[in-house]
UniProtKB/Swiss-Prot annotation:
Keyword Zinc: no
EC number: 7.1.1.-
The protein's enzyme class: translocase
Subunit-level organization: NDH-1 can be composed of about 15 different subunits; different subcomplexes with different compositions have been identified which probably have different functions.
Functional summary from the UniProt entry: NDH-1 shuttles electrons from an unknown electron donor, via FMN and iron-sulfur (Fe-S) centers, to quinones in the respiratory and/or the photosynthetic chain. The immediate electron acceptor for the enzyme in this species is believed to be plastoquinone. Couples the redox reaction to proton translocation, and thus conserves the redox energy in a proton gradient. Cyanobacterial NDH-1 also plays a role in inorganic carbon-concentration.
Extent of the signal sequence: none
Gene Ontology biological process terms in this record: photosynthesis, light reaction
Topology of the protein relative to the lipid bilayer: Peripheral membrane protein
Keywords of the record: Membrane, NAD, NADP, Plastoquinone, Quinone, Thylakoid, Translocase, Transport
Compartment list: Cellular thylakoid membrane
Stated name of the protein: NAD(P)H-quinone oxidoreductase subunit H
GO MF term set: NAD binding; oxidoreductase activity, acting on NAD(P)H, quinone or similar compound as acceptor; quinone binding
Recorded name of the encoding gene: ndhH
HAMAP family for this protein: NDH1_NuoD
Amino acid sequence: MPMIETRTDRMLLNFGPHHPSMHGVLRLLVTLDGENIVDCEPVIGYLHRGMEKIAENRTVVQYLPYVSRWDYGAGMFNEAITVNAVEKLAGIPVPRRASYLRVIMLELTRITNHLLWFGPFLADLGAQTPFLYAMREREWILDLFEAVTGMRLINNNYFRVGGVAVDLPYGWTEKCLDFCEYFLPKVDEYERLVTDNPIFRRRLEGIGVISKQDAINWGLSGPMLRACGVNWDLRKVDHYECYDDFDWEVAVYPEGDCLARYRVRMKEMRESCKIVQQAVKALPGGPFENLEAKRMLEGPKSEWNKGDYQFISKKPSANFKIPKGEAYVRVESAKGELGIYIVGDDNVCPWRWKIRPPGFVNLQVLPQLIRGMKVADMIAILGSIDIIMGEVDR
């Protein structure tokens, strides 16, 4: 009687760099025993463009348009950390109004990032419709960006050393508040559709678990860290910009699995929306059209022309020199701790520009999370990390 030969050796499978669920040019060398994952080796570098070396051969003004290509899903965080590094090293003050404008833009960028994560993540799990809902809401924010900066997704080039490029256009604050009122019920709608769906929960609950101590040891940050029960958010820890002026909560869940990472991001969208509402309503000087009218009414010596009501303290010259010294500056981006280590030597270009991207650090834990899991679970785990290869490879 003929016998069916059973394959006993392990299979080496390539996922990516062109697989649609890799979310960029990421290649995973996966060792399989049947359907079970034995090992995984991420292969990176396909999107390396030498961003650190470019920074060391450009002035800050020249380099700013480049930085949107790190995390191209949330480009304004890259601009924020670029100008913050120079401001800290050179001791450049930022007007209060400019700080509020920065916070508004950063939190809107956080929402766009999470929407861009939410849609494809659900599509990876087999739910196609939420992707269309997420893009519908994201379009509102891109229209707001376009009204202020002229660009929609990347290359906003809005942040400047000492402030921002321009003030808000007429009527922008009203449209922004309209979006916030529209968006918060939509997040509730997403939750009703998705969160308690039994298929969705079975795909995520208890999958890709990492303990609190392991998350700290690996150096994880952002939603990856807060989903392990660690209450760590740089907006609260470092007190940068004007986040202390607003009432908001850090999203923390203790389970450490894919579902907890999903819930952290959903809550962060709500909290970001609340921060935007508070910042717009408390904007120093109010909407730009009102501020401009007050200045015209009271003349050149009006208090509304003073520093706190300006959108930039002083524009740096083209030959602005970065003073001698070193500094490490970080912001809480949508994916975690985005940091810059800068060394200046009293020259127009920095002597050293080291980028600390959150995605690069968070990706390191992937092999540990997927060993012993099924192939389908690997897609869910990778999606829950939220990887953008532009910042991983730099």
